[in-house]
Structures are given as C-alpha cells and as structure tokens.
Amino acid sequence: MIIKNGEGESKIIGKAITLPTPKIFPQPFFIRLSEYTSEGNLWDNENFEFNSGKVECNGEDYDLAPSTCSLAKFDEDDGSKKLI
C-alpha cells in the first residue's frame, strides 16, 4: 500500500486481510497487516489524512480516495507485529 500526503509518500508491504465493514457511505476500509515492512513517516502516527493512495493485490492496482486513517499497532507474543 502506498499513501501520499503533505508529509510525503509512505509504503507498507506485508500479509493483509480485509475486515468486515458496516453498510454506510462512504464505506470505510479496514485492513489488518502482519509480517510487514514499512517506509516513510506515516506509519508512526496513530491518525493521519492522505490525499491519494493505492493498494496493489495480485498485480492489480486499486486507487484509494482521499481519507483519514487511524492505526492500531500490536506486538504479538512471538515477537511479530500487527497493524490494524
């Protein structure tokens, strides 16, 4: 996933699954990442806004609309990291 905002461009790569979302508009986007690596400053923030972004899955690119992102980080007992 690549996110761009006033702080620059940030990238995160890892195993991801999408999570259930409520039937509201605009529809939120929930994703959980594990075994990930990241580049850029955004992933250190709990909340941030972004102007543009994209998700790549199986060689296909999907654009993200401008939005606000909220993050929760978890350290697992086995030393791995998860990001929701």
Curated annotation (Swiss-Prot):
InterPro entries: Dicty_CAD (IPR008601). One of its GO terms (biological process) is cell adhesion. It comes from the Eukaryota. Pfam families: Dicty_CAD (PF05720). Belongs to the csb family. This is Uncharacterized protein csb family protein DDB_G0291672. It comes from Dictyostelium discoideum.
